[in-house]
Amino acid sequence: MAAKKTTSKNTVNSANGFVFQILGPVVDVKFSEDNIPMIYDALVVDNNGVELVLEVEQHMGDEVVRTIAMGPTEGLAKGLPVINTNAPILAPVGDDVLGRMFNVTGHAIDEKPEFTGKRMPIHRDAPAYEELITNAEILETGIKVIDLMIPFAKGGKIGLFGGAGVGKTVLIQELINNIAKAHSGVSVFAGVGERTREGNDLYHEFIEAGVLDKTSLVFGQMNEPPGARMRVALTGLTIAEHFRDEKNMDVLLFIDNIFRFTQAGSEVSALLGRMPSAVGYQPTLSTEMGSLQERITSTNKGSITSVQAVYVPADDLTDPAPATTFTHLDAKIVLDRSIASLGIYPAVDPLSSSSRMLDPEIIGEEHYNVALGVQGTLQKYQDLQSIIAILGMDELSAEDKLIVQRARKIRNFLSQSFYVGEKFTGRPGQYVKVSDTVRSFKMILDGEMDDIPEILFLYKGTAEDVIQAYNETKVKNKK
């Protein structure tokens, strides 16, 4: 991580405290009685020419405060002068953050000039009740499988479950692209405990996909102290809040990985000497998660819709970290490697995925009935798989054969060409409106497309595209 060099004004003369004790990433600082900083205030110390930011976590008595370092403490020595900024850590905000990459303290790490614009504190209250919008509203993504089966709530939180190589990054890029184009929205990506290599790859992939200019990236990398990993999600959220509250925009906030936020909080809690709670997690787990998640919401000014990658330790859904996260999620998207192996992207498993917005009162009766019909057909097909594997298709009843044929068409039709993948696939990207998606799947369920081979449903946007491809095939065959 690129560290910021200290300026000449950060001298002993302007200091109002000094390093009293160093315990790894925990630094105790002693102040004069009339100048003790408040909890969450940011302190600055010159560590061999590099600015190290400390965040106040506890008052220890005798004018000593206990802080957590946001950077490496190697080389720090007792007696070094410390400056109280009299403010929390400040995140960069405004239009100038788009296309840029920052660390937890808001310093640029993309080898571009340092950010000099407006900044806001990362610690803020959640919006007041009177500012919230209570009516449920759908955020159209233009991605068929999501809009049909797992509709996003504006200001909602979506959990994204997927291993390596199943298309998680591409799905994130397409969501960023579609929100930017269809809703004139912006996106913020917070890499919490990310591998440095993954963050670097993501940055360059965003450049290649042409979505970087509508995105701001914030990283607290895996090799950084727990303080940086614990606070980087708040830095990203603060950037998103400014776009929502000051620019009245719909913002997409990606947090990868929300488990690392909890993990870093657990490390900090242990370093501060707090008694651990269940499974060794911090006793403040629910409070910390709630203070982050409650700020992600829709207000009368705009919305923040969050997509959060969720790591489940040892696949144990009862583990306190994922269990606490689940209580805040409105929807979950499960990416399945077996679907990806069929060449169907996005590799979303519609049977394992779910959304609380899949409600006839919110999305309408027709959409709800079509989604249930698709779900039921795919479930029946899954139930018949073992019979097909042993006895083959010929042993099925005529009704079951029809279900299998329609299910395979639905499965293929859930595939979609992405704008961000055009240069790799050679297929033009597709943004499909919800109304077109519902109408097209209804035609499959009603048997209007029973005569069309399942292969023609792959990577088509609407039913009209499938019919056109079918007619073109018939013309070719006649020749």
UniProtKB/Swiss-Prot annotation:
SUPFAM superfamilies: C-terminal domain of alpha and beta subunits of F1 ATP synthase, N-terminal domain of alpha and beta subunits of F1 ATP synthase, P-loop containing nucleoside triphosphate hydrolases. CDD domains: ATP-synt_F1_beta_C, ATP-synt_F1_beta_N, F1-ATPase_beta_CD. Produces ATP from ADP in the presence of a proton gradient across the membrane. The catalytic sites are hosted primarily by the beta subunits. PANTHER family: ATP SYNTHASE (PTHR15184), ATP SYNTHASE SUBUNIT BETA, MITOCHONDRIAL (PTHR15184:SF71). The lineage of its organism: Bacteria, Bacillati, Mycoplasmatota, Mollicutes, Entomoplasmatales. It is found in: Cell membrane. This is ATP synthase subunit beta. It catalyses: ATP + H2O + 4 H(+)(in) = ADP + phosphate + 5 H(+)(out). Belongs to the ATPase alpha/beta chains family. Its EC number is 7.1.2.2.
